[in-house]
């Protein structure tokens, strides 16, 4: 394969034991990364490459949203927004190929373990018990009768 783009002409292996589909154009991530401007904007969503340059002015969230995800894997951002089935259907018209199998990240466990998602709510492990203790203290003082000294 020469360059960053390859077209699979027959079903088979890519030389690394990974199956490639027939008549699919494969792009390397480095090729996609070059397409990150208003003149040419490509996105990767679930291993598929989309040229959304024509869609920039039509995107309901504005062109800035697309520019932020240009040239990279935008799968997580795409899913986080919760696009409608109409938006997913519309996306098909911008499909130009797939990411080369050797550039694909594994679907299961694809998150970087150094970026622990549970730590986003670490504050809850400290703040909520403190608030609960303070609340219990106030309730205890409010509902217990004051002791009278003789």
Swiss-Prot record:
Modified residues (Phosphoserine): 23, 37, 84
Keywords: Acetylation, Electron transport, Heme, Iron, Membrane, Metal-binding, Methylation, Mitochondrion, Mitochondrion outer membrane, Phosphoprotein, Transmembrane, Transmembrane helix, Transport
Chain positions listed as propeptide in the UniProt record: 1-15
Region ranges (Disordered): 1-21
Modified residues (N6-methyllysine): 39
UniProt-listed Gene3D superfamilies: Cytochrome b5-like heme/steroid binding domain
Segments crossing the lipid bilayer: 122-144
GO molecular function, one term: metal ion binding
GO CC list: mitochondrial outer membrane; nitric-oxide synthase complex
Compartments where located: Mitochondrion outer membrane
Coiled coil region boundaries: none
Gene Ontology biological process terms, A to Z: nitric oxide biosynthetic process
Domain called Cytochrome b5 heme-binding: residue spans: 24-100
A matching Pfam family: Cyt-b5
Family membership: Belongs to the cytochrome b5 family.
PANTHER family: CYTOCHROME B5 (PTHR19359), CYTOCHROME B5 TYPE B (PTHR19359:SF95)
Known partners and oligomeric status: Component of a complex composed of cytochrome b5, NADH-cytochrome b5 reductase (CYB5R3) and MTARC2.
Protein name, per record: Cytochrome b5 type B
Lineage: Eukaryota, Metazoa, Chordata, Craniata, Vertebrata
